[in-house]
Amino acid sequence: MKKLTFCVLIWAFLSSSALAQRSELGVFAGGAFYLGDLNPSGLFSQTQPAFGAVYRFNLTTRWALRANVLTGVVTADDAISGTPERNLHFRSRVNEFSIQAEINFLTYFTGSQNHRFSPFLFGGVGVFTFDPWTYIRNSYNNLDRNAGRIYLAQLRTEGQGAPENDDYPAFPGVYNTTQLVIPFGFGFKFSLNRTFSLGVEWGMRLTFTDYLDDVSGFYVNPGILLENTGNPNSPIMADRSLNGPQVPGTQRGNRNLRDWYSFAGITLTARIGSGPGMACPAMQQRRADQIRRHYHRMR
């Protein structure tokens, strides 16, 4: 019985110590931007602040699992993106939770003197929430922030959910502001000392919606929009063109392409628990020997 107790004690100590020292907890700070109908190709265009929290579990010196909770604002404006006559604008806070796998190109672990740097790739799956909104423009065609935010999803600016008719055989469905996302990217990580690790990374997010910016398909008859929502802002926010009202059925966006967003920035993580962790199994063996000697003194 004493031998069994001793074995369980050794196993529990080594397991808890190893698990703790393989774990890292930290923060993310950087920026977020979006690619879609209002910004088709401008990488890092109109970047806004982003931040969050990171948990990493190092499976080996090459592989790790990671959980992220990130938040940031994405925005785009036709006046900046090259189509000022359409005159659309949006902003949205993006909140993301994801699980990712990391693969280090080189042997790496926090606290190592010889393996303190590695490029890495990451990819995974997650969910995110968004809720696009805009401002009206004043007589100088500037966004009037004093007038307050106008949230766009509830306005159904492309007739989402409206009943079919002869002119419009099929309207898009009402879009969900909680969606799946596929994050992937690359980065570099540096071991600062026995406890802290610094990372620099850039990740793209493939979404499964074309309404992150509330723009996807075609202009709709204003009367249908008003009847569909009962909100007079619906036709006003749907067609803000500088060159006059657009003919219903005219292209407003590109529904064949999904929207993307991106987080880029730095991470600072700290290894949970003290000791050398994966880097030094000899130290763990010495600790086990200490427990063994203490056990024999108790006999």
Describe the role of every protein-language-model region.
Residues 23, 62-65, 109, 195-198, ...:
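Repeated loop/turn-to-beta-strand initiation elements of outer-membrane beta-barrel proteins
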Residues 193-299:
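Predominantly the C-terminal beta-signal and adjacent terminal strand-loop region
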